[in-house]
């Protein structure tokens, strides 16, 4: 994946194109995930007897996840494009946190619809792929 740069030095480009593509795909998918999950929480609170304290908890966790996801994608993109290990490592740590929150929406909600399951499982798969590529990119940057 490293291509020689033209110009003054003989340095190589170490940024991961597949990782950058996954960051872009994950950002787009998360925007849809956020809206769909917000609508499903609203639907569950109106149609089913969804406990109020769980409704507040799920909404708070969804908005926390949105903030963490935005920071994660920013740090990951910045670390990948500048070939810096620290922002990419911070993004990797935030990936673990957002994966845990995604697992909450997949397994531990008071009421999990099949659409919740499908959306959260897809998001977890994206996070898993990104984590693997982030580890590979960090290893390439530290050589």
UniProtKB/Swiss-Prot annotation:
Principal subcellular localization: membrane
Protein species of origin: Homo sapiens (Human)
Membrane topology recorded in Swiss-Prot or TrEMBL: Multi-pass membrane protein
Segments traversing the membrane: 21-41, 55-75, 99-119, 121-141
Record's protein name: Transmembrane protein 80
Biological classification of the source: Eukaryota, Metazoa, Chordata, Craniata, Vertebrata
Keyword terms, alphabetized: Cell projection, Membrane, Transmembrane, Transmembrane helix
GO cellular component terms attached to this protein's record: ciliary transition zone; membrane
InterPro entries with a match to the protein in the record: Uncharacterised_TM-17
Top-rank lineage group of the source organism: Eukaryota
Pfam families associated with the record: Transmemb_17
The UniProt record lists the keyword Phosphoprotein: no
């Amino acid at each position: 994946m490293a291509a020689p740069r033209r110009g003054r030095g003989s340095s190589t480009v170490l940024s991961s194109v597949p990782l950058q593509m996954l960051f872009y795909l994950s950002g787009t998918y998360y925007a849809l995930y956020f809206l769909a999950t917000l609508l499903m929480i609203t639907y569950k609170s109106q149609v089913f007897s969804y406990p109020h304290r769980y409704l507040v908890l799920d909404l708070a966790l969804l908005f926390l996840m949105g903030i963490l996801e935005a920071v994660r994608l920013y740090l990951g993109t910045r670390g990948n494009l500048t070939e810096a290990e620290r922002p990419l490592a911070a993004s990797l740590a935030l990936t673990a946190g957002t994966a845990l929150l995604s697992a909450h929406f997949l397994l531990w909600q008071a009421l999990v619809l099949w659409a919740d399951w499908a959306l959260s499982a897809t998001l977890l798969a994206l996070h898993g792929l990104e984590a693997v590529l982030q580890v590979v990119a960090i290893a390439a940057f530290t050589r």
